[in-house]
């Protein structure tokens, strides 16, 4: 998915190809689903065992933030945006939190990381505050709520923000959560049948 995103974004940028641009967003959607699929068991393990979330956050941020900030500084220097107001919007990942929030979108590919960072920052805390044992019911409920919100905003915001807005793409990560949960349940259910043959 990562290579697909990079290739499609590059092709769309160089040749101004609208088809490749839409294809790049599809790959990003799949990337979000894959991210949720991979991180779901890690997060659920932390929640069920009531472990400190600091370890979860630390591991995630070590993998993503150093390279992000390095590239942000490099791009901002090259585009004369270092320490500008827009630069700090990228620092706090709020550049796509609302339409037209940023004047100079000098680091446009950062929108996808903003979605992931806000999701993994707030979603575990929400689940912990609800303090429920069956987290999957809450996850499915939130997923449907996000889909309804996304449908509501479909005709109210311009198309580019609809595809890249931080709080309009969170549903894809939850889809990965749900897929992993039900695949896990199916495998657990089939295991006794396999051993019984």
Regions flagged by a language model, labelled:
Residues 117-146, 180-195:
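Solvent-exposed interhelical
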Residues 87-101:
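Extracytosolic (periplasmic/ER-lumenal) interhelical loops and adjacent juxtamembrane/interface segments
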Residues 3-7, 33, 70-74, 88-91, ...:
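Lipid-exposed faces of alpha-helical membrane segments in multi-pass integral membrane proteins
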Residues 3-11, 77, 96-98, 142-154, ...:
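Aromatic-anchored segments of alpha-helical transmembrane domains
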Residues 1-45, 65-68, 94-95, 105, ...:
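Functionally critical transmembrane alpha-helices in membrane proteins and complexes, commonly lining
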Residues 25-28, 32-34, 39, 43-78, ...:
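Transmembrane alpha-helical segments and their boundary/interface "anchor" motifs
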Residues 13, 37-45, 71, 75, ...:
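Hydrophobic transmembrane alpha-helices
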Residues 16-28, 102-115, 155-175, 194:
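Interfacial loop-to-helix transition and helix-capping segments at the boundaries
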């Amino acid at each position: 998915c990562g290579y697909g995103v990079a290739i499609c974004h590059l092709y769309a940028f160089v040749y101004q190809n609208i088809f490749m641009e839409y294809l790049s967003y599809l790959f990003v959607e799949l990337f979000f689903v894959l991210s949720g699929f991979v991180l779901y068991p890690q997060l659920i393990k932390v929640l069920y065992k009531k472990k400190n979330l600091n370890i979860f956050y630390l591991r995630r941020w070590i993998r993503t933030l150093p390279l992000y900030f390095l590239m942000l500084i490099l791009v901002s220097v090259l585009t004369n945006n270092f320490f500008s107001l827009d630069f700090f919007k990228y620092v706090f990942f709020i550049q796509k939190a609302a339409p037209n929030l940023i004047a100079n979108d000098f680091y446009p590919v950062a929108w996808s990381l903003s979605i992931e960072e806000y999701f993994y920052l707030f979603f575990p805390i929400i689940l912990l505050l609800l303090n429920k044992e069956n987290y999957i019911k809450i996850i499915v409920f939130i997923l449907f709520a996000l889909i309804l919100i996304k449908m509501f905003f479909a005709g109210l915001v311009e198309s580019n923000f609809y595809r890249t807005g931080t709080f309009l793409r969170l549903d894809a990560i939850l889809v990965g959560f749900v897929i992993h949960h039900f695949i896990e349940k199916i495998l657990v259910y089939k295991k006794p049948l396999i051993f019984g043959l």
